[in-house]
Amino acid sequence: MEQTWRWYGPNDPVSLADVRQAGATGVVTALHHIPNGEVWSVEEILKRKAIVEDAGLVWSVVESVPIHEDIKTHTGNYEQWIANYQQTLRNLAQCGIRTVCYNFMPVLDWTRTDLEYVLPDGSKALRFDQIEFAAFEMHILKRPGAEADYTEEEIAQAAERFATMSDEDKARLTRNIIAGLPGAEEGYTLDQFRKHLELYKDIDKAKLRENFAVFLKAIIPVAEEVGVRMAVHPDDPPRPILGLPRIVSTIEDMQWMVDTVNSMANGFTMCTGSYGVRADNDLVDMIKQFGPRIYFTHLRSTMREDNPKTFHEAAHLNGDVDMYEVVKAIVEEEHRRKAEGKEDLIPMRPDHGHQMLDDLKKKTNPGYSAIGRLKGLAEVRGVELAIQRAFFSR
């Protein structure tokens, strides 16, 4: 695997010098300063590429080229936004950057309720608490009909939890959910959030798939023409939330994408921390079935709790993800490609890490502190080395 590291640009508290010292050779970054939907110019792409290369690294993957909400709702200037997206892909290809991670999650990108969940060893992790999320949705957001998405027990627990929250607890929970986490291109006030949810009131799973198909049929041929590989990121968490459909959550969703646009430019990001939240997702089977279309991997683990919809981000080699079997399946896919004469490695990043050691005293991007990811990268690197030596060095 190609060892990569997500970098949020010049304002990231983790420097490119830090990235290189961590042992990564590739950088995963994006032009976050360009508004959603606008074309990434060749000039801006080359400027970022030069910064990365001057640090002795390569820009391996774009994460992400965000998709304008008009495309997801099939309203407004969606045709212009699609045309802009096509041009951005052409410009990236012209600059030699050919792997693009993206997602099709409506309104919200990845979501957590607690950004400072303290683990038994004193480090901090990200957590999604189903009951706190229900309390937000029913008692803070007050979304009409939200009760239909929860069990009677969850509704009662959410009311009880809300009753114990201070004003600061409520404000913090609201910020965590709607203000935008690292990599998310949208942040909202509560009123803005309600208005954006209203745009989806008539969009169910079938309609969102229809809108996604329009996007894929416009984008994938351009990607194929210029040699770009599109790698869709799964929903996080991988299930409907806030009354919004989610359509990249299961192996069935992956198959739908392939059936909709059967091009090798239409590929996947295997994010084990997102797909792995669902107990019914067999990660190794996903890799084996869609291995030739996996162009990027996020390797991390999560741990489901007593309520199976509640989870926290575990250490990379712990939790519900069998990292050994996952890495083994990825390495096997790389060797299959090598046997076909393809030498390209699959870019891997350790994804999120725990906030730990000296980083506990620093301001960090949630999930993206340096030391926790350094630990995760080293652990996954060790797993891969052992697999390579044991199975492929003879």
From Swiss-Prot:
Example GO biological process: D-glucuronate catabolic process
Enzyme category, top tier: lyase
Any matching Pfam family: UxuA
GO molecular function: ferrous iron binding; manganese ion binding; mannonate dehydratase activity
UniProt cross-references to SUPFAM superfamilies, sorted A to Z: Xylose isomerase-like
Family per similarity comment: Belongs to the mannonate dehydratase family.
Function in brief: Catalyzes the dehydration of D-mannonate.
UniProt-recorded name of the protein: Mannonate dehydratase
Source taxonomy: Bacteria, Pseudomonadati, Pseudomonadota, Gammaproteobacteria, Enterobacterales
